[in-house]
Amino acid sequence: MNSRRLIATLVYCGWVLLLALGIHAPQGAAGQVVSGMYKVTETTDLGTQVRVTLQIRLMNAGEDTIFVTQARLRGFPHSGRSEDKPAHVILEPHGSSEFTQEFTLAKQEYELWSKGARPHLGLNVQVGGGAATTITIPLMQRPGLR
């Protein structure tokens, strides 16, 4: 009985930590105006890892054009173990853009998605003609798709 209580406490603490990290995710200049959705289009089982192809839609609610140069699927908690993938996406003011990207991640992490965990996407962006910065956004699953 004690081991069950310990496991439950550890799981609860882990979820609290994930929630806290999600709330305090690093935000750049474009962090408040960029949001994203994803759809899994293909998966390949690689043993302890999974190769996932995502169709990603980014939305820009701001007044400036945003140039996305690289995308990285962030781990839980934001481990940053994923490699940077080139992404040549232009987000016009109040516009959106879709692109497809392939990522390799731990199978355990991928399985968390089906339990409600949201993947986070690290983006290298340039807003207007300004300096390059990095933002991290949570991706929402596109309704009814998977």
Q: Predicted regions span which residues?
A:
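Bacterial N-terminal signal peptides
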Residues: V11-A20
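Low-complexity, acidic Ser/Thr/Pro/Gly-rich terminal tails and inter-domain linkers that flank the onset
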Residues: P26-T48
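Solvent-exposed, conformationally flexible loop/turn segments
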Residues: G47-Q49, P93-S96, G130
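Short, solvent-exposed loop/turn segments enriched in Ser/Thr/Gly
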Residues: T48-Q55, G116-P119
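Asparagine-centered strand-capping/turn motif at beta-strand->loop junctions
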Residues: L58-G62
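Short acidic, flexible loop segments centered on an aromatic residue
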Residues: E63-S79
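Short, solvent-exposed, Trp/other aromatic-anchored flexible loops in extracytoplasmic proteins
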Residues: E83-H120
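Terminal connector regions
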Residues: K107-R146
